[in-house]
């Protein structure tokens, strides 16, 4: 548990830690009997522009709890002295407590682990290089921007990093590539891969979190970092597929953007990082000059109750946003249960995962000459074998050898368990029947086919009607377009926001199922250096790449303005106009807690008309509304702060969504919009109220001109419900007849005294 001061309410941040230094001395003796472990200490905004002076102040602070200057110096793991001030050090629990007791200290918390969570994607999203007036060409494909990744490293030989035809490296870039095992900057970096660093000091002294297979360099064994960077910003690579599946030209969302990798993920099996290492990478990325940060990492969910600020990812991202760097992060992969969404803070752009209009299948031809298709990502040769039904696949294994096995399961984990069991017992293949409209994402080198219960029952009837049932399974094939329905994936974590329910999370959805990307050629599941990845990890770089394009078009927009443009222009249906569903039990129409504002639409986002902008004063509003005292807020923001009395309402944060988790009586919510479209514009309000909720907008019309670029409005919310309810959903739009600026409305009724 972290040690935090100046807190009057239960926790805001998960997973980060920090402190502040103003030169106050507390003399203490180091306890030689206590175990030392890494603590991350955040000191808020830098007191000096000179990074050496900042580091010296860290040294002096540590000397106050150590017996000698040398011992203090040896305890330091990382100095954070570029984008913000802080350090990671090996401390005893009592030393951490002594630091936290200082009047100039904000918080201290122990180092933790943090988990990681294309040939069709961008055509599906309408982002085509063949459109001369589209956002791709208008932004020069992101050529002048650098996108940073905090991930597992790169495989630099991948064609995704080809720099042919790229212009010189942007002048604002100050980063570099660092040499290491099998990584030579002169050979492996170029005008595409412009930065590559690795960080190991945040692990324990014997580096127990680092796999022996990995490289002590920016080179990544696992390939996750190569995947996410290629999804966001791969150069054009023709004739790519995964063993014949998903064939086409691979490209990132921003094909000319430059890539900087900060390797912080080392555990090959669990794909984890440490918080101390992550904070150091944030600090370096800010100083290097990245323009956008993509982070496929999240704290574990569901969230435990917390009474301290321990938000490494959250506070690192806050400092980045304060420097004008948008931070895009995944919602996590613990859905479809409610309250599982991660990365829930208002300065982050949090991404849920959907499928796209592409699936992979195999033909199953049975001995009665009936052919049925099932989902499969099998890339091997055609298989002919006997067919057997096994109800209890864990214990009844004697009949599996050389046969294709049919079994029925209820849960996701059972699919993997059945696959492992049939593989060990040398079955020729596996057909799994499962309830619901589930999209399989398992890539395997033997026939593995998913069907629903209805199809499974047909296959079972054939088996029982035949004395010697047989099956022939084709190699996998690719199907694009109708009739594949767009849906939010079952694994994609769901809202509401468990820490600040009035802040909608996730914010946006993007494709994250069977996404083709480049990977490490050392990785066993790689097929010629490519892989089909599934998870919010892969939806995140889709949005990050699109943000690069928007920032290239609008370099003066703040991260909040870019986020607003993404959210207010999102599709509420799929690109063909069909409804978006949400996987789960039962399957349902998607709502804002599944997909945020909707499915990302970059072409509309380039010209949103109006934006809900935020700056440091808005974030101070958020901190005050959630219970932080003036001293704590001043430390973390660097701006002298005195919260109003009574405290401001979190409902009035200028967020591009209105979420009211506990409507007891009529409430009025305020928002401000900034005109980024034609100077002389008139917008009128259009409301689709949640069921049983009355919405009144004042004024109903907004008139902008050269002297009026920002206008405020009020939304009065009341309900006719007489009892407690769940959430009801609607939307609110400002429209000028061409541009529709839409935000989600989410309201839950709480009648405390019926």
From Swiss-Prot:
**Location in the cell:** Secreted
- Inhibitor I9 domain location, by residue? 39-116
Q: Extract the SUPFAM superfamilies matched here.
A: Subtilisin-like
Q: Which residues form the signal peptide?
A: 1-28
Pfam families registered for this protein in UniProt: fn3_6, Inhibitor_I9, Peptidase_S8
Return the similarity comment: Belongs to the peptidase S8 family.
Specify the protein name: Subtilisin-like protease SBT3.12
Q: Which gene encodes it?
A: SBT3.12
């Amino acid at each position: 548990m972290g040690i935090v001061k100046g807190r009057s309410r239960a926790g805001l941040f998960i997973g980060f830690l920090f402190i502040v230094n103003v030169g106050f001395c507390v003399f203490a003796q180091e306890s030689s009997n206590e175990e030392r472990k890494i603590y991350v200490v955040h000191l808020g905004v830098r007191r000096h522009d000179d990074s050496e002076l900042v580091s010296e102040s860290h040294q002096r602070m540590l000397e106050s709890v150590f017996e000698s200057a040398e011992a203090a110096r040896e305890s330091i793991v990382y100095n954070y002295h570029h984008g913000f001030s802080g350090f990671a050090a090996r401390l005893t629990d009592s030393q951490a407590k002594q630091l936290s007791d200082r009047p100039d200290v904000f918080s201290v918390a122990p180092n933790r682990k943090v988990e990681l969570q294309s040939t069709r994607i961008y055509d599906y999203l309408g982002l085509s290089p063949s459109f001369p007036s589209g956002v791709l060409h208008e932004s020069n494909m992101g050529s002048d921007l650098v996108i940073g990744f905090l991930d597992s490293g790169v495989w630099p030989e991948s064609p995704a990093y080809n720099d042919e035809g790229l212009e010189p490296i942007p002048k604002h870039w100050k980063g570099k590539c660092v040499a290491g095992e099998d990584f030579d900057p002169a050979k492996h970096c170029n005008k595409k891969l412009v930065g590559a660093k690795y960080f190991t000091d945040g692990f324990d002294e014997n580096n127990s979190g680092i796999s022996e297979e990995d490289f002590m360099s920016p080179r990544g064994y696992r390939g996750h970092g190569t995947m996410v960077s290629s999804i966001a910003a791969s150069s054009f690579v023709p004739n790519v597929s995964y063993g014949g599946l998903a064939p086409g030209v691979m490209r990132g969302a921003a094909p000319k953007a430059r890539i900087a990798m900060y390797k912080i993920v080392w555990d090959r099996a669990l794909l984890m990082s440490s918080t101390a290492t992550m904070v150091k990478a944030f600090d370096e990325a800010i100083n290097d000059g990245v323009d956008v940060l993509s982070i496929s990492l999240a704290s574990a969910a569901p969230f435990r109750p917390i009474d301290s600020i321990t938000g490494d990812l959250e506070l690192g991202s806050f400092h980045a946003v304060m420097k004008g760097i948008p931070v895009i992060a995944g919602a996590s992969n613990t859905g479809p249960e409610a309250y599982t969404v991660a990365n829930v803070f208002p300065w982050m752009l949090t991404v849920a995962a959907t499928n796209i209009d592409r699936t992979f299948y195999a033909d199953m031809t049975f001995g009665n000459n009936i052919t049925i298709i099932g989902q499969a990502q099998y890339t091997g040769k055609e298989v002919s074998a006997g067919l057997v039904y096994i109800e209890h696949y864990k214990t009844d294994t004697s009949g599996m050898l050389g046969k294709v096995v049919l079994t029925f399961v209820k849960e996701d984990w059972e699919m993997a368990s059945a696959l492992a069991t049939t593989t060990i017992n040398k079955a020729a293949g596996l057909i799994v029947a499962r309830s619901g409209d589930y999209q399989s994402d398992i890539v395997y080198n033997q026939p593995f086919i998913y069907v629903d219960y209805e199809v499974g029952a047909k296959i079972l009837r054939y088996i029982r009607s035949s004395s010697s049932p047989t099956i022939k399974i084709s190699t996998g094939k690719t199907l694009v377009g109708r009739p594949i329905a767009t849906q939010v994936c079952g694994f994609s974590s769901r809202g509401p926001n468990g820490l600040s329910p009035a802040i909608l999370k996730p914010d946006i959805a993007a494709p994250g199922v069977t996404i083709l990307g480049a990977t490490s050629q050392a990785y066993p599941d790689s097929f010629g250096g490519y892989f089909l990845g599934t998870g919010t990890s892969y939806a995140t770089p889709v949005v990050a790449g699109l943000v690069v394009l928007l920032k290239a078009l609008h370099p003066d927009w703040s991260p909040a303005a870019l986020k607003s443009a993404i959210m207010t222009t999102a599709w509420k249906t799929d690109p063909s106009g069909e409804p978006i569903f949400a996987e789960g039990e039962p399957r349902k129409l998607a709502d804002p807690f599944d997909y945020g504002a909707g499915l990302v639409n970059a072409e509309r986002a380039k010209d949103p008309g109006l934006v809900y902008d935020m700056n440091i004063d808005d974030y101070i509003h958020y901190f005050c509304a959630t219970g932080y005292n003036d001293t704590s807020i001043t430390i973390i923001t660097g701006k002298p702060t005195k919260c109003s009395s009574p405290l401001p309402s979190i409902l009035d944060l200028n967020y591009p969504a209105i979420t009211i988790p506990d409507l007891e009586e009529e409430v009025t919510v305020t928002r401000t919009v900034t005109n980024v479209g034609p100077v002389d514009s008139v917008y009128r309000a259009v409301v689709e109220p949640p069921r049983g909720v009355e919405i009144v907008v004042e004024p109903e019309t907004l008139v902008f001109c050269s002297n009026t670029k920002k206008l405020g409005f009020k939304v009065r919310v009341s309900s006719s419900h007489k009892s407690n309810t769940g959430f009801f959903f609607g939307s609110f739009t400002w429209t000028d007849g061409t541009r529709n600026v839409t935000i989600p409305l989410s309201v839950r009724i709480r009648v405390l005294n019926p």
